[in-house]
Amino acid sequence: MAVFLVERSIPGMSHHDLLLAARALEESCRRLAPGRVRHLRTLQVLGGSRCLSLFEADSKDLVARANNAAQFLFSSVEEVEEVVSRGGDRTDLP
């Protein structure tokens, strides 16, 4: 499966509302296509009015459909590639 980054503008959205929206994303992924689209995490840009969500999915279309089903508006959906793993190691080194 590929990884996708969803960017959205969230002016005036509280932390609590963002938590509820992230839960709605998780639920819409489970209902829409179990095992084919999964919400990994949502990050809020501090001091700004944006958030970024990561998804693992079979297609960009599935990610867009999951976001639409959760009624969480977004600006873009792009496929991304990990450059540094969680442990801090580069993924392209032997």
Cite the ranges covered by each PLM segment.
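Short S/T/G/P-rich N-terminal loop/turn motif that feeds into the first structured element of a domain
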Residues: 1-31, 40, 48-49, 60, ...
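Short, well-ordered coil/turn elements that cap or connect secondary structure elements
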Residues: 32-34, 69-72
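A short linear hydrophobic-aromatic micro-motif
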Residues: 36-42, 76
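Short hydrophobic/aromatic beta-strand micro-patches
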Residues: 54-56
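Conserved short beta-strand edge segments in small beta-sheet-based binding/regulatory domains
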Residues: 72-84
